[in-house]
């Protein structure tokens, strides 16, 4: 079965909200693929609460454990899960999620990557050289 990995981008932005909104609308049940969202458990639980969504989360420690499901894979803890406030302390979290998604696609031809919005300025402020998703991929 094919797998779609979603790297939600900056935790302060709309990326996590987009995924949660689609999950809340049961959109992913229509897709004939495993769907994996990369991210911190606390981030998604707190954001779902902010949005008023009553969702159940399945977190996995290994992408290979996901079979015919929608799940979350926590690569790294997010230092600041505040919505709407950019914080460069999250730069490593954002880059690690993106790089994990890229590496997974390179290792498995049945895996696709969808990326959420990233603040380039915030990543540079966090110490990373980053000019965009396309260049990094």
Question: Could you describe each region identified by the protein language model?
Answer:
Residues 1-136:
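Contiguous, glycine/small-aliphatic-enriched amphipathic segments in soluble metabolic enzymes
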């Amino acid at each position: 079965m094919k797998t779609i990995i979603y790297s939600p981008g900056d935790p302060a932005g709309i990326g996590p909200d987009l995924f949660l909104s689609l999950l809340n609308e049961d959109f992913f049940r229509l897709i004939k693929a495993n769907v994996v969202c990369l991210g911190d458990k606390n981030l998604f639980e707190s954001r779902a609460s902010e949005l008023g969504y009553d969702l159940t989360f399945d977190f996995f420690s290994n992408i290979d454990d996901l079979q015919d499901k929608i799940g979350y894979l926590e690569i790294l803890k997010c230092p600041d899960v505040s919505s709407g406030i950019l914080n460069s302390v999250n730069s490593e979290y954002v880059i690690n999620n993106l790089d994990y998604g890229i590496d997974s696609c390179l290792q498995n031809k049945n895996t696709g990557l969808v990326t959420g919005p990233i603040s380039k300025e915030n990543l540079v402020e966090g110490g990373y050289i980053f000019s965009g998703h396309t260049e990094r991929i």
